[in-house]
Design a protein with these regions (language model features):
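Active-site residues of response regulator receiver
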Residues: 63-66
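Residue-level signal for the "D+5" position in two-component response regulator receiver
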Residues: 42, 69-70
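A short, hydrophobic beta-strand element within the central beta-sheet of small alpha/beta folds
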Residues: 86-107
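Two-component/phosphorelay signaling modules centered on CheY-like receiver
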Residues: 23-41, 116
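Acidic, metal-coordinating helix/loop segments flanking the phosphotransfer/catalytic sites
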Residues: 44-60
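Non-catalytic signal-transmission and effector/linker regions of two-component phosphorelay proteins
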Residues: 1-23, 27-30, 127-153
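Short amphipathic alpha-helix used as the core "switch/output" element in two-component signaling
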Residues: 73-91
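Alpha4 helix (beta4-alpha4-beta5 surface) of REC/receiver domains from two-component response regulators
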Residues: 74, 101-123
Length: 153
């Protein structure tokens, strides 16, 4: 006789990497997205972001475009190489913090960032829209995860 036991995972459901040189900005972003279901790693430069990306998987990346040591573009490029090397089917949503006008006014930069997997842009002074964008991206990711799975009986 087998037990019909449902194992409910404990601990955080979503892992975030927040890479920004400002302690204050990282704190604001953490405050906007932190729940019991999130685990958040904060770093202050691009090299530290790459170290964390090599250590483990993240569900959402929040990157400052002009990070010190390695900028956000370099971080995204190297992250893409890591994903390709691992042949990972999971590509976490990425949000870039920058001056919105800087990106919106530069079609080439916008296209390049999107080709690297950037899903959204937020002004470098994060606002409540950050939480809404993160929620939308997580819902889209969850939908991608469930596509192709057999329906529960």
């Amino acid at each position: 006789m087998t037990d019909n036991v449902v194992h409910i995972p404990t601990g955080p459901r979503w892992r975030f990497l927040i890479a920004h040189q400002s302690d204050a900005v990282r704190h604001v972003i953490r405050t906007l997205v932190e729940t019991e279901q999130t685990s958040i790693v904060e770093v202050a430069d691009g090299e530290a972001a790459l170290v964390e990306l090599e250590r483990g998987r993240f569900d959402v990346l929040v990157l400052q475009l002009d990070l010190p040591l390695k900028d956000g573009i370099s971080v995204m490029q190297l992250h893409r190489l890591l994903l390709a090397h691992e042949r990972s089917p999971v590509d976490p949503p990425a949000i870039v913090l920058t001056l919105a006008a800087e990106v919106r006014g530069n079609v080439t930069l916008t296209d390049h960032l999107q080709s690297l997997g950037v899903d959204g842009f937020i002004d470098d002074a994060p606002m409540p829209q950050t939480a809404a964008l993160v929620e939308t991206l997580l819902q889209a990711r969850e939908a991608r995860r469930t596509i192709g799975k057999p329906a529960a009986a």
